Amino acid sequence: DLYGKSKYLGEVCDQPHVITLRTSGIGHELRSSNGLLEWFLSQQGKVRGYAKAIYSGLPSVELGRVINRFVLPFPKLHGLYHVSGTPITKLDLLTLIAEVYGKQIVIEPDDTVVLDRSLNSKRFTEATGYAAAEWPVLIELMNGHRY
């Protein structure tokens, strides 16, 4: 698809001393509410939670930790690596965020959107030893690093 092709075209993956991390981030924004987290936290009443849309990114605070502890210490690491968490539906992700953040909102399950852009981090894990924590832990971490 166009999304995948555009990502591929922007990735440098065949040069020594160059690493490309393919990932997706979720987290707090400084001046906008364009991302999923800030959008969700700004909503009132009810929202739809996509039961068949799969997400496997990581909180931005965790991505920073990954780079600091699992990329920088490996100067010979090069090429393209996927860095991700355990795949989770957007419905389950929003439900966990609501629980951890104490957000009072109704999340209506919606199965009309079917999308799986999950990543497989096996190669990165084998190269670095990194394995993402479970989603409740990651969301607690994200909540603890509000700006």
Give, region by region, the residue ranges found by the protein language model:
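Active-site helix of classical SDR
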Residues: 2, 6
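NAD(P)-dependent short-chain dehydrogenase/reductase
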Residues: 8, 12-55, 61-62
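Alpha-helix C-terminal capping segments
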Residues: 10-17, 39-44, 70-71, 83, ...
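Glycine-rich Rossmann NAD(P)(H)-binding loop
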Residues: 49-54, 80-88, 127
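Amphipathic alpha-helical segment in the mid-to-C-terminal domain
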Residues: 60, 90, 131-135
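Amphipathic alpha-helical segments that line or abut small-molecule/effector binding pockets
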Residues: 61-69, 136, 140
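Mid/C-terminal beta-alpha module of Rossmann-like enzyme folds, strongest
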Residues: 66-69, 73-121
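C-terminal amphipathic/interface module of NAD(P)-dependent oxidoreductases
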Residues: 104-147
